[in-house]
Amino acid sequence: HQNIPAKAWWFGLAAGTMACALLEANNMRDITGDQVSGKKTLAARLGRDKAKWLYVLCIAMLCAGFVVGGQWITAVIAVAVYFPALKLAFSNKQGRELLPMLMISARAQLIVGLVTTITFFTTLR
């Protein structure tokens, strides 16, 4: 771990929390069904009100990873592409109505991943 640059750790945090945000979006969509069937997803255990804040925390952590890693513009892009999903998280929509949140989160992960890759390769020295 001593040979791995700090920037790589911060980008790893961002990538990991993007994946967690996608999982959380999926689990938020299924909260009611999971609670009825006895599934113990984190979102089902937390309930909708706390689960939406966990989703926000994932987005905040991925942005923090980029900012601390020196890629603040990627953090700004991430906020922009995740914003529609964040709005849905705080809406009254439930179940299948939250499917767009899952799709937006997946698309956002792809976009932010591409921006990260482009940024990485254009700043190599």
Question: Which residue stretches match the model-derived regions?
Answer:
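Hydrophobic alpha-helical transmembrane segments
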Residues: 1-21, 45-49, 54-125
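Acidic (Asp/Glu-rich) catalytic motifs at the cytosolic membrane interface
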Residues: 20-43
